[in-house]
Amino acid sequence: MTKQDQRAERHIPVLLQPVLAGLMPLVGAKVIDGTFGAGGYTRALLKAGAQVIALDRDPHAIAAGQSLVDEFFPRLRLVHMEFSQLDRVVEEKVDAVILDIGVSSMQLDEAERGFSFQKDGPLDMRMAQTGFSASDVVNHLKAKDLARIFKILGEERYAGRIARMIEKRRAVQPFLRTGDLAYAIEALVGRKPGDRIHPATRVFQALRIYVNDEIGELARGLFAAERVLKAGGRLGVVSFHSLEDRMVKRFFVSRSGEGMRSRHLPEIKHSPATFFPLFKGGITANKEELQQNPRSRSARLRMGVRTNAEALAEDMKLFGLAEIASFEGGKK
């Protein structure tokens, strides 16, 4: 058994029981797991008798999942693809889609991937291992653009100070390691005894989201799921921070037939409902799960049931997102 297989065996998927209860996978049901990761949801769905198409853009996850393909052949199909393209892998409507947004435990545990400052490694953070890295971003974007990334994607209160520090320090020595960046941020911001959250947490979150275009990926994935679900099909989304959760909430509200009501956004005209919520406010982990799996602390599950109405047009404006500079100098 490889190290990746061992990590997958130890992986505990968050909110698994609420996910299964909500999706209600019947024997033979066709389900898309858009974020395969360590395969926790996929394995549970297969054990329930479902047929699963599992996607992941991380080649390491695909390689680690081959043993699961062999175990459940022919009911599991594993595809190296971003979940925003999930409507490209099916020709018929499906019964359910599940998305577990963000970084996986396996990615966090591998120091060489550069997702976490808990273990020193290269400042990388690329899920697909292609394109620009977090080091590229930190060492080349202007301070004002870094500040917007930290503020918008990480909700970091010291975004400006941290960005200016980075710009000044990199002129002398570039940031190449996760530990180096985390230490520099902690030295600038400080850390009080007993602080539960490391001062670099939000900056690392923002960089990861930016490098992997996770916000754009989530938006496109929600629209794609709307197109592939049959009437009565269920869409479940597990998110781990408020920015993602607000996007998911806005999506379901905009698809409820009631339109969006916000003084900050243009009002969306009423359209036929394409989803109705399965439960109000989302589901979070109970005390038992929190004790068994601390990672579930920030997880929230929202779920909707597809109606027979036609899928609505994609409209990024409904998410109310601010623009940030792209690495190439345009807009992301």
From Swiss-Prot:
CDD domains: AdoMet_MTases
Predominant location category: cytoplasm
Record key words, sorted: Cytoplasm, Methyltransferase, rRNA processing, S-adenosyl-L-methionine, Transferase
InterPro entries for the chain: RsmH, SAM-dep_MeTrfase_MraW_recog, SAM-dependent_MTases_sf
GO molecular function: rRNA (cytosine-N4-)-methyltransferase activity
Localization terms from the record: Cytoplasm
GO terms (BP aspect): rRNA base methylation
Role description: Specifically methylates the N4 position of cytidine in position 1402 (C1402) of 16S rRNA.
Protein name per Swiss-Prot or TrEMBL: Ribosomal RNA small subunit methyltransferase H
Source organism (scientific name): Bartonella tribocorum (strain CIP 105476 / IBS 506)
This protein's encoding gene: rsmH
